Amino acid sequence: MFYRLLFASLWYILPAYVANASACIFGGGTPVDLGKNFIDGRRLIGNGVTYRGCIFGILCGTLVGLIQGILVDFNIFNSLDFYGTVLDHVILAFFLSVGAIVGDAVGSFIKRRLNIERGKPAPLLDQLDFVIGALAFGYIVAPIPYEMIIIICLFTVFVHLLGNIIAYKLGIKDVWW
């Protein structure tokens, strides 16, 4: 029972994970805030959220939804029938992807208001901003039970910390967080 719930949770949030990662991988270029400052004199969002990253993040996350829909349509994962057709998967993935990008941007906005520089730690905000955005947008088209929300949040924090520790040990990151 738990493994089925865990798998369903990860299946649901996968497009958001891919959208968030793709935005980082393919990002760069013009920041969405166009270099503008907020009324407090600090940048609205900063250089970390760019148009290219947003577009590629949403496209890649939505593509994952298409692949998920095809896999379900071919009964490869027939136990996850509560998500519906291929089109349902694509629509959900689009909403999750947009939510992930918006959540990340909101997280950056909050960090700027708290005077936390880009790349500096903001515990839980750094790990969950995109997930909260994705869950909020995804809930519009495919609500999920609170157990899945808890699993997604806990899993995300765990994987984020584990990934950072591994990157630190490998010398890819300067800090473990």
Swiss-Prot record:
Q: Which family does the entry's similarity section mention?
A: Belongs to the CDP-archaeol synthase family.
Q: Which residues cross the membrane?
A: 6-26, 54-74, 90-110, 124-144, 148-168
- Could you tell me what this protein does? Catalyzes the formation of CDP-2,3-bis-(O-geranylgeranyl)-sn-glycerol (CDP-archaeol) from 2,3-bis-(O-geranylgeranyl)-sn-glycerol 1-phosphate (DGGGP) and CTP. This reaction is the third ether-bond-formation step in the biosynthesis of archaeal membrane lipids.
Keyword annotations:
Cell membrane, Lipid biosynthesis, Lipid metabolism, Magnesium, Membrane, Phospholipid biosynthesis, Phospholipid metabolism, Transferase, Transmembrane, Transmembrane helix
The answer to whether the entry has keyword Zinc-finger is no
**Protein name (record):** CDP-archaeol synthase
Q: What organism, scientifically named, is this protein from?
A: Methanocaldococcus jannaschii (strain ATCC 43067 / DSM 2661 / JAL-1 / JCM 10045 / NBRC 100440) (Methanococcus jannaschii)
Q: Which gene encodes it?
A: carS
An annotated GO BP: glycerophospholipid biosynthetic process
GO-annotated cellular components = plasma membrane
